[in-house]
Regions:
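An N-terminal structural lobe/cap that precedes and organizes the functional/catalytic core
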Residues: 1-15
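Conserved NTP/Mg2+-binding pocket subregion across the NTase superfamily
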Residues: 11-121
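Residue-level marker of positions within ordered structural domains that often coincide
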Residues: 36, 138, 201
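Extended, basic/helix-rich recognition subdomains
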Residues: 105-169
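Structured mid-to-C-terminal alpha-helical surface segments
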Residues: 144-205
C-alpha cells in the first residue's frame, strides 16, 4: 500500500489546480481525503483526514497543512458523492459509503449556516457565501445537491424582489459573464444573508 503524506498530496495537487478566474489550463481543484473506517459505520461528525482547495494555496506554499479534524461538512460531501460521482477505481460511492441519515444531513446544513453571523464572517468571500447559502437553501428544501449556478437560479425564483439582483449578480460572476462586485454591496449582501439564513432555519426546524 502506498502511503502519501499531506505535503506530498497537497503539493502535487497544486500542480494540476489553478485559482478561480485564472484562465489557465487547469480548473480549481478540491480534494477531500477520508479513511473509510472513520466514516463507516457512519457517525456525526465524521473525521476528515485531509482537504485541499485553492483557498488553502497560500498556506500550502508556506508549508502549513491542516491536520485531520472532525468535520460536519462530510455529511454533505458524502451525500453529494453518493448522488453524483464517478468511481475511478473500485466500487461506486453509493455502495462504498453508507447513506447519511436525513437528520445528520440537515444538522450539517444548519451547522454550516451558523458560521455566518456578521460582515466579518463573509468579508472578502461574499460571492461564495451567497452561492453557498443558495445551495444550502436548495438542499434543505429538496434533499438534493445542485451546482452553485443551478441552486442560485432556483433560489432567485423564490426570493422577494429586493434580494434577486444580488443572487443574480453572484451567479453571473460565478459563471464569468459579469465582474464580481459583491464586496461593494455591503448592505445588500448582509440583508440577503439574514433573509436566506432565516428561511433555511425555518425549513430545517
Amino acid at each position: 500500500m502506498i502511503s502519501l503524506s499531506p505535503p506530498t498530496i497537497c503539493n502535487s495537487a497544486l500542480k494540476v489546480s489553478s485559482p478561480p478566474g485564472d484562465g489557465g489550463t487547469w480548473r480549481p481543484l478540491e480534494l477531500t481525503v477520508v479513511a473509510r473506517s472513520e466514516v463507516v459505520p457512519w457517525r456525526y461528525p465524521a473525521r476528515r483526514e485531509l482537504q485541499f482547495g485553492e483557498w488553502l494555496r497560500h498556506d500550502i506554499l508556506s508549508g502549513t497543512f491542516e491536520p485531520a479534524v472532525l468535520d460536519h461538512d462530510l455529511a454533505i460531501l458524502l451525500t453529494k458523492a453518493r448522488q453524483h460521482s464517478l468511481a475511478l477505481l473500485g466500487p461506486s460511492a453509493a455502495t462504498f459509503f453508507e447513506p447519511v441519515p436525513k437528520e445528520h444531513f440537515s444538522k450539517a446544513l444548519f451547522d454550516t449556516i451558523a458560521q455566518w453571523n456578521a460582515e466579518s464572517d463573509w468579508k472578502g468571500d461574499e460571492r461564495n457565501v451567497v452561492l453557498a447559502l443558495a445551495r444550502i437553501w436548495y438542499s434543505a428544501s429538496t434533499g438534493l445537491i445542485a451546482p452553485k449556478d443551478v441552486a442560485a437560479a432556483w433560489v432567485s425564483e423564490r426570493l422577494p424582489a429586493e434580494h434577486r439582483p444580488l443572487i443574480c449578480k453572484a451567479r453571473a460572476a460565478y459563471l464569468g459573464s459579469e465582474d464580481d462586485d459583491l464586496a461593494m454591496r455591503v448592505e445588500e449582501t448582509a440583508a440577503f444573508v439574514r433573509y436566506a439564513k432565516a428561511t433555511i432555519e425555518r425549513i430545517l426546524r
